Amino acid sequence: MPISSLTSQASANGTALAAQSPIVFLHIPKTAGQTIHNALAAMVGGRHVSPIRTHTQAPGDAPQMPAGYALYSGHIDWTELETLPGGRFTFTVLRDPRERIASFYFFLLKEAEALDRDALERPENHGKKLILQRSAEEYFFGGPAGFNAFIRDHYDNFYVSYLATRKMRGRPELRDLTAAQRLEKALANTSHIDRIYPISGLGQLEADIAARFGAQISVTGTYVNAGPMAREQSRWPKLLNRIATDRGRADLEAFAEGDLELMERLGVST
């Protein structure tokens, strides 16, 4: 049943949602998240959207889920989830992790190619400078140690580490666990998430929003911040073709093994 204080059309009462049942969208990069965020933000109204869209916007002990908002959406940690009202609706979206890795790579490459020389010299664009200067294999595995940590945190079985630690860059916390232990920890934490949708099943998200909140969103087949290739194109083979060695291809494929097993255990299709 929809919450009685919400409308049955395209919008929802953001004040009521903030007090009773905020929406929490755990946005994993390159999973159609900007499209979903835009639709939900329009539904609840901009002033009811948490300003924290990435974990880096809340340094130190600052909350990533500050109280009083109807929508929490972004590349954020979710360690504070239980501080929100008990009627919250928490969800995330997964896609084939190999396609996510490749999509992320080609998206960053496209962004880097659009920067001028001065912009590429800025510290915050160091990774984009490297993606232009290096082969794909060197980008993923060429170091130095600090950049390797960035690569591992964002590409190496990210679904497992994000769900297991509830943090965008929580992977170091798992260093003493076996792959099986990491997977079990991730699976255990999914009990705190109401729905996990495949990227191919966003129609169910639309239906769930309508049923739960009496409001309508349209996200199926609409993609914001898409990469340079057509949506129906598989990016993974194109990325593998840029990896020169068998060892490099095997190492890159290992970045998706745990996530593929996680999706299989969850019954979420790729």
Which stretches of residues belong to each language-model region?
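PAPS-dependent sulfotransferase catalytic core
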Residues: 1-69, 71-78, 103-104, 109-114, 218-269, ...
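Aromatic-acidic/polar surface patches that form glycan- and anion
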Residues: 18, 26-29, 33, 83, ...
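Residues at the C-termini of beta-strands that transition into short coil/loop
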Residues: 29, 53-55, 75-76, 94, ...
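A structural signal for well-ordered alpha-helical segments within the folded catalytic domains
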Residues: 30, 34, 95, 99, ...
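PAPS-dependent sulfotransferase catalytic domain
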Residues: 59, 74-92, 99-220
